[in-house]
Amino acid sequence: MTTTLPANPPPFGGSPDLAGRVRRRFATGRAEVSPAAVVEAVRETGGPVLGDRDVLRLAARVHDDLVGAGPLGPLLADPEVTDVLVNATEVWVDRGDGLRREPLSMASPDAARRLAQRLVAATGRRLDDGAPYADAILPDGTRLHAVLPPVATGGPYLSLRTFRRHPFTLVDLVARNTVPPPVADLLAAVVAARLAFLVVGGTGSGKTTLLNTLIELVPRDERIVLVEDAAELRPAHPHVVGLQCKTSNVEGAGAVEMTDLVRQALRMRPDRLIVGECRGAEIVDLLRALNTGHEGGAGTLHANAIADVPARLEALGLLGGLPRVALHAQAAAALQVVLQMRRTSTGRVLSTVGLVAAEGPDRLVTVRPAWDRATGVAAAGADLARLLATRGARVPELLWGAER
């Protein structure tokens, strides 16, 4: 019979000594740390008589401490939690409305260090005094970054970005007030018209969430190829293939970079090419791809406002050896729409929809607001409506007035 432990067990009120004895039984590493083995160890370890429910609760806690995320396990299992941060013993959590200090804390900085080292080691990577920081992807998709002292001056520090098992749909984002209902129709029209777009914003603003949601709107008969530094996008779409970067081995060889992956993706017959985060020379390959028949592509970019996007593209283009004038020419032809995400005190919101245009004698790229959360439809709304109509897409009601 298969033993299943509670995924998010309630607090166990039994003896901490009993839990410690059970942990020590597995400390040698010779015994398999399976749910059934932990339950058996709880029953065999001398102590107070426990009912089945308490046995399962204690076993779940011990199992999580040995192979899971320890005291952070319940937080990572909470579907509302997006980020869990550990500063030595302090635990901070973001549930979509900003960081909040949790009543929970790590037992000691050493306990935080041991947890970080165990989680990183389970992914085949190293975290110790000789390699004091590491990135890892946990088996459930959670992204982990850990830094040890003395590099972490008050650490250790752990940063965990959770993986949402049931991604948000566009309906969900409307219900959460991330996207107003009329703008949801506009976003659907952008995808249907195969307009290439960038989702921009600061760290933790919801860029990946919105991109994942919009990918799900791609017609089911199209093939989507994802290129990411670390796999985060999990769209509910029947034909998605993904590529992710690979770090070098201990000899410093074997790394696979984003630029390599974009070029490989172009050989995989993509109907839509999606670059999870443009932060280097791969922007050059993406723009070239979008200009050679791969319409409807998308990506994310760190930028605090739509007006900052051209300068950000310039900086990334230089990393790929693309001169300023050539970068602007490529971007003007390849990109049509920019979506600005922002994190507020009440949650993450879509703040602006911008239209990419080339202006002036040098034909430099600008991004003009077509819709703004504070002011509504803006000057470029009419141009966006005409572009959608030209592409054969239904112009959403939001832009009806602007179209005339």
Where are these regions (language model features)?
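NTP-binding/hydrolysis catalytic cores, primarily Walker-type P-loop NTPases
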Residues: 347-404
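Conserved P-loop NTPase nucleotide-binding/switch module
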Residues: 228, 235, 265-340, 345, ...
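P-loop NTPase switch/communication element
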Residues: 164-175, 212, 216-263, 309-313
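Hydrophobic anchor at the beta1->P-loop junction of P-loop NTPases
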Residues: 199
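P-loop NTP-binding catalytic core
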Residues: 78, 92-193
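Conserved lysine of the Walker
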Residues: 207
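P-loop (Walker A) phosphate-binding loop of NTP-binding proteins
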Residues: 190, 202-203
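N-terminal accessory targeting/assembly segments
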Residues: 1-127
